[in-house]
Amino acid sequence: MPMRIERDLHMATGNGETSYTKNSRIQEKVMFQIKPVLEEATRAAYSALLPQTMVVADLGCSSGPNTLRFVSEVIGIIARHCKEHDRRHDYPQLQFFLNDLPGNDFNNLFLLIQQFNKSMARNHKGEAAEALPPCYISGLPGSFYTRIFPSESVHLFHSLFSVHWHSQASEQLKDTKNKCLDIYITKNMPPSMVKLFQQQFEKDFSLFLKLRYEELVSGGQMVLTFIGRKHEDVFTGESNHLYGLLAQSLKSLVDEGLVEKEKLESFYLPIYSPSVGEVEAIVKQVGLFNMNHVKVFEINWDPYGDSEGDDVHDSIRSGENVAKCLRAVMEPLVASQFGEHILDKLFKEYARRVAKHLENEKTKHAILVLSIEKAIIHV
């Protein structure tokens, strides 16, 4: 079945061993790293208007525990801010919208919300009524490459590991015969194909910024976190290695006769890892936002590998950990193109290849975090 973004782009559902819920530690670690940026943006968004109801949206929320960690973090930031400014008797109501494509596991998300609400009530039972701001949480299915909110209605947008995904499967990329069998950018890929990846990101991110500008209130803030790259050279990105090893694993299944070569020739990952320069250039070109903060930091491929050294202590275990994380993200896309029957074998082979790679080179994700504010446009 051909890949369709709105249907197939979602994390692995449920609570099983290969689910996103069980394999989202990388995202958790990144959320911890961006806390200062999120706090600054949240305080600025609230301080701009001191709204009685503050609307916050998480775009590409998925359905794991990190979604509610974000909600909890924002609640805590607003509570601290109000206490510091002697407004604890005048908390805003917090309205959270958790947005993702319709294929997202919203059933699991709603169960998590129910548990979260019960936990909040239990933890603050008997405390003063003003202990925390009241919050209301809703799910919102739909593509963030369309308008999803009324004009000037949102105070804070947040998106973690979502805006680097394409809005749609590029027909030009699908129709290009990929004789190298690469699924992401490599040095062997024709320059025309590389350009298609870049152009799709530029088109999508420009549209995303224009849509969010319409939906943000004056003084509204946005914090976006991408898997990016450290260097401007498109061929030197860390993602090239990560996805290149997946391509090699798929090629090995072609050699074994388990995957049709024609299917791999027409398959690519609808994703792009941008550089700081590319992101800054698009923000400036669109001209609707002021840039507060942009930086790149690194985090180990292995979500459980916290050492800062250059060596991987257990490459086999690390390979398995990396494979579980990538499977939780890529499983629906891969299954839609090649079938579910190849998944176990594919990611076992991928784990082996990652382990071999890590024996020679400890590779890290380059994480790009961007904080921007809605600009005042004088007509």
Swiss-Prot record:
Catalyzed chemical reaction(s): anthranilate + S-adenosyl-L-methionine = O-methyl anthranilate + S-adenosyl-L-homocysteine; benzoate + S-adenosyl-L-methionine = methyl benzoate + S-adenosyl-L-homocysteine; salicylate + S-adenosyl-L-methionine = methyl salicylate + S-adenosyl-L-homocysteine
One annotated GO biological process: defense response
Keywords: Magnesium, Metal-binding, Methyltransferase, Plant defense, S-adenosyl-L-methionine, Transferase
UniProt entry tagged with the keyword S-adenosyl-L-methionine: yes
Binding-site positions, anthranilate: 27, 164-165
Keyword NADP tagged: no
SUPFAM superfamilies: S-adenosyl-L-methionine-dependent methyltransferases (SSF53335)
Start-end of Basic and acidic residues biased regions: 1-10
Residues given in the record as Mg(2+) binding sites: 265, 267
EC annotation from Swiss-Prot or TrEMBL: 2.1.1.277, 2.1.1.273, 2.1.1.274
Stimuli inducing this protein: Up-regulated by herbivory and jasmonic acid, but not by salicylic acid.
EC class of the enzyme, as a word: transferase
Binding residue positions for S-adenosyl-L-homocysteine: 20, 61, 66, 100-101, 143-144
Molecular function as annotated in GO: S-adenosyl-L-methionine:benzoic acid carboxyl methyl transferase activity; S-adenosylmethionine-dependent methyltransferase activity
Domain of life: Eukaryota
Stretch list, region Disordered: 1-21
PANTHER family hit by this protein: S-ADENOSYL-L-METHIONINE:CARBOXYL METHYLTRANSFERASE FAMILY PROTEIN (PTHR31009)
Function: Methyltransferase involved in the biosynthesis of methyl anthranilate in response to stresses. Utilizes anthranilic acid as substrate. Produces exclusively the O-methyl ester. Can also use benzoic acid as substrate. Low activity with salicylic acid.
Family in the record: Belongs to the methyltransferase superfamily. Type-7 methyltransferase family. SABATH subfamily.
Protein name: Anthranilate O-methyltransferase 3
Organism: Zea mays (Maize)
